């Protein structure tokens, strides 16, 4: 079941890739993918290329994939291990969701962080109290780690 669904998503991605994103299997393991997200133009991550790993559980799509950044990023909802705080990867997962939709949700999270549900409270505090500083550090990290 999982493999059939993963193969379908792969062909859908090839046919209709989401803007600024790409994803596909690492080697022959269909349950382990690498994804790429281009830093959105209207964000301090503009110009950066961010890599993520995607691990599908054997009971996918009934359980969400594990998605994590491998490129370091300065963001209140993404910690230094690359873990992403995004409701659809946890409690709000639905089998109707696809990797394409997950990647687009992560892109929109880059444009619009959610400082009220942070993984990194200190970055959330800076985002809320000193947006210029947040944008400056985000741009510095993007130049340092994602270019």
UniProtKB/Swiss-Prot annotation:
Coiled coil: none annotated. Signal peptide: none annotated. This is Ubiquitin-conjugating enzyme E2 D3. Belongs to the ubiquitin-conjugating enzyme family. Accepts ubiquitin from the E1 complex and catalyzes its covalent attachment to other proteins. In vitro catalyzes 'Lys-11'-, as well as 'Lys-48'-linked polyubiquitination. Cooperates with the E2 CDC34 and the SCF(FBXW11) E3 ligase complex for the polyubiquitination of NFKBIA leading to its subsequent proteasomal degradation. Acts as an initiator E2, priming the phosphorylated NFKBIA target at positions 'Lys-21' and/or 'Lys-22' with a monoubiquitin. Ubiquitin chain elongation is then performed by CDC34, building ubiquitin chains from the UBE2D3-primed NFKBIA-linked ubiquitin. Pathway: Protein modification; protein ubiquitination. Changing residue 87 to K: Abolishes affect lysine reactivity. Phosphorylated by AURKB. GO terms for molecular function: ATP binding; ubiquitin conjugating enzyme activity; ubiquitin protein ligase activity; ubiquitin-protein transferase activity. It holds the Pfam family UQ_con. Disulfide bonds join 21-107. It is a peripheral membrane protein.
